[in-house]
Amino acid sequence: MAEATTAENTQTGILGWVERTGNKLPDPVFIFFYLIIALVIVSIVAALSGVSAFHPTAIDEATGSALRIDAVSLLSPENIQRLWVEMPATFTHFHPLGYVLVVMLGAGVAERSGFFAAGMSKAVKSAPKALLTPVVALVAMLGNHAADAGYVVLIPLAGILFAAAGRHPLAGIAAAFAGVSGGFSANISPGQLDALLFGITEEAVGASALDPLWTANIAGNWFFISVMTFVYLPIIWYVTDKIVEPRLGPWKGGATAGAQADDMSPDPADERGALAAKGLRHAGYAALFVVALWLLMVFAPGTPLVDEAACEAVPAADCSIHTQLAPLYRSLVAAFFLLFLLTGWAYGRATGKIRSHRDLVEMMAESMKDMGYYLVLAFAAAHFVAMFGWSNLGLISAVHGAAAIQSTGLPLPLVLGLMVLFTGLLNLFVGSASAK
């Protein structure tokens, strides 16, 4: 024990500094509490100093000029009353809370029924040996919808399959880990993380008070995450096959336990064999049903997910197809909930994992147990975001921040690049997406 402690304390270099610094950071929940304390102090100083900004769009009806927004102390009687009286509403109205919990109700069933694990296993084991590395990397990236199943199932499975193909298992483990962890935010479809982040984005915009009616779309990051899937894929493939595996040397251990060098198909006696194939087939039918249902609600008469009257209340120049499709975008959280729920239920029924509705309810309840820490974090984050808005510092900082960036004369791509670099640096110390 003493040796391990000594080794940890003597780590040098940039990675050692990053690890030591990260370990010294408090829990993300307390980071938010410390930020709230700092916010209270800043709001008092700003209010006493008369800090203000002019709203970029709102007009003061009394003067006809831009509306002036003054900083408000969080220790004012109104804000103290709001803190205690509205505490339940502040927590429950936190947008990411509802979005994430709804999606996880369905994803929890898909994970606990074995659907995610079986789907990843089937995809990887069906890969030609020549394409084993890119298939492992791709399935690993897609597996971020499966939460911990990507780490628990795919990483060791990749090692077994590489050994069965006569390749070094550590190369397979490296490729799978790079896909699961390094490609965590790359996918061909939105998922739980997108539900979390677009909810936080809505809260941030709401706190700025720039546009209270603005809403985000869970598919807003889809272009980025889908493109990054195919950017990461060749990189992982090249690094694994051309850099990592040659350094490991030839594999002389033969096929590992549970795998045969000339047979990479699942054991028919295994649940992930013939029985799993039946479950995956039923899950596919369930997925087609959900897709058909959403298409029906978009194109069928009545079009409940298309607001055909949306353009009647806005000028023709401001109306677009996206305005009319707003209900469809807002329904995607429910769509992913239903997709994960029905595919997991269909798989579980076919394999015997779910024998009655009680098993289904138990899986949903278990998934909510796993969200306990997130609920605590959401409570702290919700109050920080809300208090930021109550103090008017959100709008004031947004207006003055935009003016400061504009005054530098830096081109927008460079500003965005600096933001990406800052976020990447922050990732080394704070792993939680919601905490960042």
Residue ranges of model-derived segments:
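Interfacial loop/helix-cap signal at membrane boundaries in integral membrane proteins
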Residues: 13, 52-96, 207-217, 300-328
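Membrane-interfacial loop-to-helix junctions in multi-pass transporters
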Residues: 89-97, 124-135, 169-171, 326-334, ...
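Hydrophobic alpha-helical transmembrane segments of multi-pass integral membrane proteins
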Residues: 100-102, 128-159, 164, 375-384, ...
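Membrane-core helix-loop-helix motifs of multi-pass transport proteins
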Residues: 19, 23, 27, 155, ...
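Core transmembrane alpha-helical segments of multi-pass membrane transporters/permeases
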Residues: 28-33, 37, 41, 62-117, ...
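Hydrophobic core segments of alpha-helical transmembrane domains in multi-pass membrane transport
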Residues: 32-48, 100-108, 139-141, 179-183, ...
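Intrinsically disordered, low-complexity non-transmembrane regions of multi-pass membrane transporters
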Residues: 1-24, 53-75, 245-279, 309-317
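Juxtamembrane interface elements at the cytosolic ends of transmembrane helices
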Residues: 11, 113-119, 234-268, 295-312, ...
